[in-house]
Amino acid sequence: MTEQHSGFPRRDAEGRIRTLGDLLGVSLAGLVIGVLAVVLFDFAFASFGAGEFGQANGWLAVILPAWLYWEDFRAWEFGAARVVAALAAGAAGVTAGLVAAGLAAGLPPLLSGGLGAAGFTLAYAVVWFPGVRWLARRTG
């Protein structure tokens, strides 16, 4: 198996992310960028009088990590392993995100949604990465 040496995250010849650390690092960086973008837009709208600051939906911060996960999903060959792993990771991610957002329910939507997005991002990566590899080995 040859490796592609063009940047970060490191990918194998099929375009799959090689390590869990790379997946977590890039997805968390995407989450931070997403949170900063939502904060910037929320601040801009609040300064124009279009609502109070902190009322934007922090769940929007999950867009970049979800895009990364979609690209990694597409890099795996067609089969049940990637679908089952994605469904399990999605269920774990949504559950972790909703629990995190629920525990922070008294906070503004920007913060509680951001915490929910962080819970989703972490849980999805931790379930997807080993899950798809294990299932791909099991199904051949």
Task: Give residue spans per PLM region.
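Hydrophobic cores of alpha-helical transmembrane segments in multi-pass inner/ER membrane proteins
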Residues: M1, L60-W67, F120-W128
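N-terminal signal-anchor transmembrane alpha-helix
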Residues: M1-S47
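Alpha-helical membrane-associated segments of multi-pass integral membrane proteins
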Residues: L20, L36-V39, G102-G140
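Transmembrane alpha-helix entry/boundary detector in multi-pass membrane proteins
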Residues: L40-A61, L111-G119
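Transmembrane alpha-helical segments of multi-pass membrane proteins
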Residues: A81-V99
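Membrane-interfacial loop-to-transmembrane alpha-helix junctions, especially the N-terminal start
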Residues: L24, N57, G79-A86
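The transition from N-terminal targeting/processing segments to the mature protein
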Residues: G49, Q55, A66-D72, A100-G102
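Canonical alpha-helical transmembrane segments
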Residues: W59-G79
